[in-house]
A protein has these predicted regions:
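Hydrophobic beta-strand scaffold residues
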Residues: 27, 46, 115-116, 259
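Conserved dinucleotide-binding and phosphotransfer motif residues
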Residues: 23, 111, 255
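Helical "substrate-binding/catalytic lid" subdomain
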Residues: 144, 165-293
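Rossmann-fold dinucleotide-binding core
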Residues: 4, 76, 91, 97-190, ...
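NAD(P)+-binding Rossmann beta1-loop-alpha1 motif at the extreme N-terminus of oxidoreductases
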Residues: 1-61, 87, 124-127, 288
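Glycine- and other small-residue-rich loops at beta-strand/loop junctions that grip anionic moieties
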Residues: 9, 65-66, 93-94, 161-162, ...
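Rossmann-like NAD(P)-binding element
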Residues: 33, 44-102, 127-135
């Protein structure tokens, strides 16, 4: 029986684990914070110590990390580097910055441990029933565990991208594209909202989600949200970002590549958090000064 250890049993990690179990893989799971209600209903073998996960797996070990990028991933790589044996394989399925991935790959190489980067898309549903996987790392290493990626991916949803970091690089660009597409959908509905027509947004989204050129997962989730609350009255229009959009833009600046749509979509997210509206106040005051245009006073 093939075995995989999975570290990080949040929404994505837990659903990937269930996907593995459906594919007859024996899965050992570890997380610092375990949701017992979720875990008790599955065939997942849950361990409370990282060392126990490592010792439970047959060698060469395959460990899939599904944890937040940055410091959490960094610390985990350090710990695993000390615990694992030569020829073991770590898969980073999170949204790590590709430059960090290359550095970690080189660090683990000193211990003859392989790091494979796997850009993972498709959300929670994809993790559970078939994900989109962009994989980077040494070709021979990736070939040796291609059975795992093929098991977890939707049909035609897995590709070996290239050398270390390339999987995370392609996922970063994917997320940048996602920002731009989401912003365009948001702006379209904003225009509908300001029109003189009394529109049923759920009907609009349903039609757009079925057979139109702009159909797809993002329109499907828009329809799902509007079906619950057509005017989104319960939601504040504040949008967070998880870093990949910024990394995409930084890469474009470095390579001198023009990506105005992705850049504008990230800046729109920043603006959504701006309660001061200071730039708007500056522009309004300039118009007032040079042209006597009206300014609106605070009530």
């Amino acid at each position: 029986v093939r075995q995989v250890g999975i570290i990080g049993l949040g929404k994505m990690g837990y659903n990937l684990a269930l996907n593995m179990i459906d594919n007859d893989i024996l899965v050992f799971g570890y997380d610092k914070f375990i949701n017992k209600d979720l875990i008790e209903n599955s065939k997942l073998v849950v361990l409370t110590k990282l060392q126990d996960l490592v010792t439970s797996l047959a060698r060469p070990r395959v460990i899939w990390m599904m944890v937040p990028s940055g410091e959490t991933t960094e610390n985990l790589i350090d710990e695993l580097g000390r615990m694992l044996s030569p020829n073991d394989i770590i898969i980073d399925g999170g949204n790590s910055r590709y430059t960090d991935t290359i550095r970690r790959y080189k660090y683990l190489k000193e211990f003859d441990i392989s790091l494979v980067d796997c850009g993972t898309s498709g959300g929670v549903n994809g993790a559970r029933y078939g994900a989109s996987l962009m994989v980077g790392g040494d070709l021979e290493v990736v070939k040796s565990i291609s059975w795992l990626f093929e098991s977890l991916a939707i049909k035609d949803g897995y590709a070996y991208i290239g050398e270390s970091g390339s999987g995370h690089f392609v996922k970063m660009v994917h997320n940048g594209i996602e920002y731009g597409m989401m912003q365009a959908i948001g702006e379209g509905f904003d225009l509908l909202e300001h029109s003189h027509y009394e529109l049923n947004y759920k009907d609009v989204a349903r039609v757009w989600a079925n057979g139109s050129i702009i159909q797809g997962l993002l329109m499907d989730v828009t329809l799902s949200a509007l079906s619950k609350d057509e005017k989104l009255t319960s939601i504040a229009g504040r949008i967070d970002d998880s870093g990949e959009g910024q990394w995409t833009i930084e890469e474009a600046l470095k390579l001198k590549v023009s990506i105005p749509v992705i850049a504008a979509s990230l800046f729109a997210r920043y603006k959504s958090r701006d309660d001061l509206l200071f730039s708007e106040k500056i522009v309004a005051s300039m118009r007032n000064e040079f042209g006597g245009h009206k300014v609106y006073k605070k009530k």
